[in-house]
Amino acid sequence: MTKLSGILLAGGQSVRMQTDKARLFYHGMEQYRYVAKMLSTQCKDVHLACRQDQSFDINCIYDLPEMAGIGPAAAWFSAFETLGHAFVIVGIDYPLFNEQELQNLIQERDPQANASVLFNAQTGFYEPMLGIYEWSFYQKLLSFKHEPIISIQTILRNSLVKKVLPLNEKAIISIDNPEQYQSILKSLNEK
């Protein structure tokens, strides 16, 4: 199977974190660099999905102007419009997601499904920012294009999705506030 393009999702505005989560340091480097490096080991090319007002030193796919204000789904629209094919997406919110988890996700890919996405068995929800999205998912996405807010989670629930379980449940812990950030830094420093 051909290698996928890798999309690093870094465009979200983090009100709770009060800083750009892509610039947080984990693993001795900014999180966006860590995720880009990880994706480069498994993907044919790596792109960073972000807002128009953000600037990074790697290949960016900026949210399309007509997608402004629709939330994270802007990254999916922009990636499909720019690339025109399937991709693996990894959000910067998951500092414990590693290369083994990425390899597992890619190995578990089902190209006949609309998507292959990590599933959180504890919450019963998909982790949309950790998945592989086939071109057929774009067709589903387009049917929601004129909604004021587009939920990738909702589209996944109405699609053919391969549930992929993480090798380690901690890999899908999302860091969303300063307290969680400090806690994860402490646990990483103890290793």
Describe every region a protein language model picked out:
Residues 1-128, 132-137, 143-149, 157-172, ...:
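Nucleotide and nucleotide-moiety/phosphate-recognizing core
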Residues 154:
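Active-site-proximal helix-loop-helix substrate-binding element of RNase H-like nuclease domains
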